[in-house]
Amino acid sequence: VRLAAMRVVGVGAGAWGLPAAAELAGRGHEVTLVDRSGPANDLSSSPGPTRLWRLTHPDPVRVRLALRSVEAMERLEARTGTTVHLRRGLLWRDDAGPGDVHEALRGEGVAHEVVDPQDVGRFLPGLRPDDRPAVWCEGAGPVLAAASMRAQLGLFEAAGGVLERALVRGVEPVAGGVRVHVDRQAPLTADVAVLAPGPGAVGLLEGLDVRLRLRPRLEQVVHFGDAADPGATDGYACFVDRPHFADDGDEVPNLYAMPTPGRGYKVGIDRPLRDLVEGDTDRTPSERTTADITDRVRRDITGVPPRPLDAQVCSWTESPDGRFVLDTLPGGVVLACGDSGEGFKFSALMGLVLADLAEGRTPDADVAAFSLARFATV
């Protein structure tokens, strides 16, 4: 069913906001997308060449959404002729054992293999074994993030979408729609506003009287490899090494890793550089964090040269429970925030999900599980 054309203002041109704007424009709506610095800018959560997609999750809802996300990426590729994801497989190692992941994957019919602790190096060269079994799943690989954003921008522009670089100061439901207050210009009026502002959600939600404890923070990743041949690890598998305790009793933070074609093996650990506050535009990598990640690679992933080739800082926004927040607010406002470090793996799917919410469609049970209702008693 094709709905009557609406006026839509999107706030945030990142991994969720740009695909939503592109999808809505493609459905025939009049879409203006507002972002202070433009799509996937260096201050946002969405810059850089790659992210990690995976079917491996410890709960069935996210496994199902991940399967839908792969379909959405394939749809984007078919529409644009652009490759936006690669398949390399992923090894998941967890202090809790493979139980939850194994059950979630098996329940959704996803092929996988439980790997003995001493056999992990068969899937990732040089991975140091310990006493933890792992789970191997071929359904994983790099999202070609920059290519994906370019493809979405092309769809948005081809469908007549308008991009404005401006700072959004507030969003106000009014009779018959919504008013978006923009710095140094007249407010924008629309039937619906789609808010996917990343860290900017903190201030905008306060103005909408939504009480949600979001925590924007800065994280860092490092590419490793041989400078003379940075593509040597292009065929390597991805890896998630969940938090655990070392032999000496120290807590070891979560590690995630993937190949970036032609650039090296990308590794990050879940240890924020600092909380992100309004006005913080410094994205200088931390030498201490680079050294810590290098030590981890040298110790645990010996098949990757422990030589940093580059480092990058970007923002995450943690929700109170580490899960996305997707909902429709009274007065024609669609909310998408709390990426919690996993936003890009669902980027193409979020375009479809948020467009459906903007059109007033009832979300399915899996999408509805991410609504604000779960915080009603928090």
Predicted regions and their residues:
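Dinucleotide-binding Rossmann-like beta1-alpha1 core, especially the glycine-rich loop
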Residues: 49-123, 131-132, 254-255
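Glycine-rich FAD pyrophosphate-binding loop
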Residues: 26-45
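Flavin (FAD/FMN) cofactor-binding and adjacent substrate-gating region
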Residues: 93-160, 164-165, 170-175
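Conserved beta-strand-loop-beta-strand element in the redox core of flavoprotein oxidoreductases
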Residues: 170-188
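C-terminal catalytic lobe of FAD-dependent flavoproteins
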Residues: 299-378
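Active-site substrate-recognition segment that forms the wall
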Residues: 22-26, 82-85, 199-331
